[in-house]
């Protein structure tokens, strides 16, 4: 039996990864992390979506220690979430230091326990918002370290790594789940479900990608199929 663990936040990217994983694996587990994030509604949404889409199991882990250590606008109500700024440079204050290091490590331990061969994460270098822990070289390096550390060949899969946001929308549509992703996920940094607040960087990226896909869906779908090896 092919088994995978999806790092699952209930947002656009991880939900799209879950949708795809359910087509390729017999047994799919979701793991969600409660780190005291300001948009805590994502935990309930992740529960709802994992049940709705048919995941085998959904594990929510309390990692509140990350909140104590990592200062970010996503972990501190006192730090305002910035509006989208096309000219912004450097790492944004929405970056949570160490988050993906911790999440992928804990997901690997869980995968070890349930006998999963893969850990799937929705990180993306094409539209990575300046987050260093969304880069391909980081994921591959951590994967190598994990394999050495637990002596188990657990594979990190990053199906969105080289897709832009329009192609990520196309992937959801390919599996006939575009409306599920659009209306039932939470990507917004301000914790607003669906199309979100429309002002933060996450909402801008998501809306811009959807508009690009809707404006030329045939071309975007063709590009997706070529990149992802889909028919």
Swiss-Prot record:
Residues involved in ATP binding: 8-18
CDD domains for the chain: QueC-like
Family annotation (NCBIfam families): 7-cyano-7-deazaguanine synthase QueC, PRK11106.1
Biochemical pathway: Purine metabolism; 7-cyano-7-deazaguanine biosynthesis
Reactions this protein catalyses: 7-carboxy-7-deazaguanine + NH4(+) + ATP = 7-cyano-7-deazaguanine + ADP + phosphate + H2O + H(+)
EC number: 6.3.4.20
UniProt remark on cofactor binding: Binds 1 zinc ion per subunit.
Residues noted as binding Zn(2+) in the record, renumbered to the chain: 188, 197, 200, 203
Organism: Pectobacterium carotovorum subsp. carotovorum (strain PC1)
Domain of life per record: Bacteria
This protein's name: 7-cyano-7-deazaguanine synthase
Family: Belongs to the QueC family.
UniProt keyword terms in alphabetical order: ATP-binding, Ligase, Metal-binding, Nucleotide-binding, Queuosine biosynthesis, Zinc
Function as written in the Swiss-Prot or TrEMBL entry: Catalyzes the ATP-dependent conversion of 7-carboxy-7-deazaguanine (CDG) to 7-cyano-7-deazaguanine (preQ(0)).
InterPro entries cross-referenced by the UniProt entry: QueC, Rossmann-like_a/b/a_fold
GO biological process: queuosine biosynthetic process
Matches recorded under Pfam families: QueC
SUPFAM superfamilies: Adenine nucleotide alpha hydrolases-like (SSF52402)
Cofactor(s) of this protein: Zn(2+)
GO molecular function terms listed in the Swiss-Prot or TrEMBL record: ATP binding; ligase activity, forming carbon-nitrogen bonds; zinc ion binding
PANTHER family in the record: 7-CYANO-7-DEAZAGUANINE SYNTHASE (PTHR42914:SF1)
């Amino acid at each position: 039996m092919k088994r995978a663990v999806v790092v699952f936040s209930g947002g656009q990217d991880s939900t799209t990864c879950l949708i795809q994983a359910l087509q390729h694996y017999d047994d799919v587990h979701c793991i969600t992390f409660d780190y005291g994030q300001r948009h805590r509604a994502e935990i309930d949404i992740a529960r709802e979506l994992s049940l709705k889409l048919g995941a085998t199991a959904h594990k929510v882990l309390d990692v509140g220690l990350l909140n104590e250590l990592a200062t970010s606008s996503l972990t501190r109500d006192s730090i305002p979430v910035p509006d989208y700024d096309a000219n912004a440079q450097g790492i944004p204050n929405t970056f949570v230091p160490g988050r993906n290091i911790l999440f992928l490590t804990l997901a690997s331990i869980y995968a070890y326990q349930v006998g999963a061969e893969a850990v799937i994460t929705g990180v993306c270098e094409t539209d990575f918002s300046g987050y260093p822990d969304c880069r391909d070289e980081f994921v591959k390096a951590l994967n190598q370290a994990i394999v050495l550390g637990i002596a188990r060949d657990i594979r990190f899969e990053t199906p969105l790594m080289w897709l832009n946001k329009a192609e990520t929308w196309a992937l959801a549509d390919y599996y006939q789940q575009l409306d599920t992703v659009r209306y039932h996920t939470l990507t917004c940094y301000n914790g607003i479900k669906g199309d979100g607040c429309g002002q933060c960087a996450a909402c801008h990226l998501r809306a811009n990608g959807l508009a690009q896909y809707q404006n030329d869906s045939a071309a975007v779908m063709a590009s997706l199929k070529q990149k992802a090896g889909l028919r």
